[in-house]
Amino acid sequence: MKRRLYIPQLLMTLAIRLYASSADTTVIEHTMLWNSVRQPAWQNPALHGTAYLSSLTQLHVEADWQKQSEAFVLEKGKGFFLPAAHADTYLRLSDHAAVWGHASYMNGKQYDICWNSTSDFDLLNPHILADSVGGDTSYERYVFEGGYATQLGRWLLGAEMLFRAGHEYRDIDPRMRGIVNELTIRLGAGYEAMGYHWAAAFEGNVYKQSNDVDFYRELGVSPEYQMTGLGTEYARFSGDKRSLHYEGGGIRLLLDAEPLAERGFYGHLDLNEHRYHRQIIENYTLPLTDLYSQGVNAVIGWKDKGRKQRALYATVDYEKRSGDERIIGTSASTAFPELGVLTMYKNNRLNTSLTALYG
């Protein structure tokens, strides 16, 4: 009797150990530091389909907290508390096809924001609505993402869609509110030749934000400024113009060369251009400013995923931002003639880095 029980117990123990080993291997494959080397290429959905050999679904909750005694950037406030829940999945349908998805929900607070009454400051600055009072804001965000990739002979094909919705508001005066919707679609293709995946992807992006500030107290209101640059404003339309609408978007081109054996030189090039249009929404619609952003991100390096993982790569990130102000004539009823356009804001940013990885 003991002998009969021993054999099933031994088989169960071996099965549990094999299952645990397989699960550990899967988690390691999806979370290893080496993936950071391949992350730029995975922006192309065709290459993302080759990211992993195994399937994995993960659920996790996190909280990001920061507190400053003095704000480093006034428009971003003195800190935040942003808890979030995430769900991620990557499923291999076969040796030649994969699907993936991501969903997240964030709901938290941002503290002591001043001189900024507009959501997505990093995206839209300096063309924001601002006041000198400010305060804490509540922030809510939804993100959904899904993609599919397949391989047909030497060809890799993939598509991906991302949607982001955000809601930022303050429930005391000045009661700012920003409602954001953003949709991004990527299409990618790659070809296998000479030991490399040669890939290209195209991205289209559409962005909208409704932005306004209200006052409920009877003690009066504070002026809202239509910011146009570093400490500059569009004085004519500052003060009581507190309802704005932003719309815009842009395009990206991604080019990649990835060695099939994970050993050799590789490169990534990201070219992008975006435009964001600001208009006043009162009893009329008045175009006010246009913000332009052109960017180049390039990565070139060498890597070897052998017994020891080694990589050395250089990154160059360049962005050119400029802002146009529309010169508006005297109104006739609710019509404002446009007399001209002046470029009154320019800002160039360049970041470079050299990274080595060994493990």
Where are the language model's segments positioned?
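N-terminal, post-signal peptide beta-strand-biased segments of exported outer-membrane/organellar beta-barrel
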Residues: 20-111
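Outer-envelope beta-barrel architecture signal
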Residues: 53-59, 95-101, 153-159, 194-200, ...
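Residues that define the transmembrane beta-barrel architecture of outer-membrane proteins
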Residues: 55, 79-85, 138-144, 174-185, ...
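Transmembrane beta-strands of outer-membrane beta-barrel pores
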Residues: 61-69, 105-109, 152-154, 163-167, ...
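Outer-membrane beta-barrel translocator domains and adjoining extracellular loop/strand segments
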Residues: 69-76, 112-118, 169-177, 211-218, ...
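Residues on the lipid-exposed face of transmembrane beta-strands in outer-membrane beta-barrel proteins
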Residues: 85-91, 144-150, 185-191, 253-259, ...
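Surface-exposed loop/turn segments flanking beta-strands in extracellular/periplasmic regions
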Residues: 113-130, 219-236, 333-340
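Surface-exposed extracellular loop regions of Gram-negative outer-membrane beta-barrel proteins
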Residues: 147-171, 180-183, 268-281
